[in-house]
Every structure is written in C-alpha cells, then in structure tokens.
C-alpha cells in the first residue's frame, strides 16, 4: 500500500505571498514530515507518522522555507542543553540571496553580546552568497539567518526551539514586535565555533 504525506502550511511574518498561502497571511514554512504529519493511504486511511514508523521520539522534521524577507538572527540549543540539541541543514532550491552563518573570526564575546543588545549583530556575522544547488549545514549553537528571496529545503533534528537574537524591529499585522530571547540565545551560542562556514555547492540538482 502506498502512503502520501499531507503537508502543513505555516504562516510567518517573513513568508511568501504565493498560491500556497493560507488565509491572508504569508506562508513561511510548509512542514512535509514531522511527528504529527498525517500519512494517507491509497485507500483513504490516515495515520500519524510517529505511529506508522513506531519511532519515539520521532528523529527529524522536514520542511521547506519560503522567505520573501530576511528571517530573524537566531540560534538553536546545542549539546548538553535543555531543551535538546537542534542541528539542521539547508538545501537551496530556488532564488538567490545571502545566508548569515556564524560569528566572524576575531570577534570577542563581549563585543558580540553588545552587538546583540544594541541591534548591530548582523555586522558581526559571516555572510554567504547562496544559490540553487548549495547545501549549508547549521550545527546546534551556530548563530544564523536565512536571507529573503530564497526557498530552501530544511532537515532538522526534532526540536522546535528557536532563540531570536534580532528581528529588525519589524511589526506584525497587529502592530506587535516579535519576542526576542537574548539571554537564552547567548547562553545557547557555541563559542567554540568561529570563522566562515563550509558551503557545498552543486550537490542538489536545480531545475534547468
């Protein structure tokens, strides 16, 4: 019997207004495979992915990100932390733009923390040009941000915790800014990871 995944669309302030949008808000993420994903058989039977694969805890989440605008500067928890570690990788599918990845070599911890608190943290991060076919790994504890104009396939460990360090002071449709998690984020940074990220190019087949 053949089963198909039923995707879940998630609205995000930085998302894309396209035919996949849900309601009137931009869709930023489409979750294709996660613990709550429903699988539908050719006979119409539905079952949760975690039950189908008999896997607890479910190890990964697979989704696409549709970024019309820059995502927040953020970091995910690392090893020996609570909540659990969150590694992830991005495969660039469409568009071109930049990815912020890791703290620039030679930046002191004190200078970085000051930059986070005064809103100049972007200047402290490595900037990578990204295009279809590129693959970039984001180990837990790496400060990063996806740039606008990119569509990426993201595979991550099953942890949904994100600490926002900077969000450009933007406001949602209700006029509210999104919550920042400065202290938690700084505590989650892997300070042993400095310098430019490794980027693998041409490993994902791009249309054309």
Question: Predicted segments — roles?
Answer:
Residues 78-80, 106, 143, 151, ...:
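Residue-level signature for short turns and capping positions that connect secondary-structure elements
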Residues 108-112:
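Short, flexible helix-coil linker/hinge segments at the edges of structured domains or between repeats
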Residues 88-90, 145-169:
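A short hydrophobic beta-strand segment most commonly corresponding to one strand
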Residues 76, 129-148, 155-157:
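Conserved metal-binding segment of the jelly-roll/cupin
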Residues 1-107, 167-204:
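Transition-metal
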Residues 114-121:
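Short, structured beta-strand/loop micro-motifs enriched in basic residues and often containing a Trp
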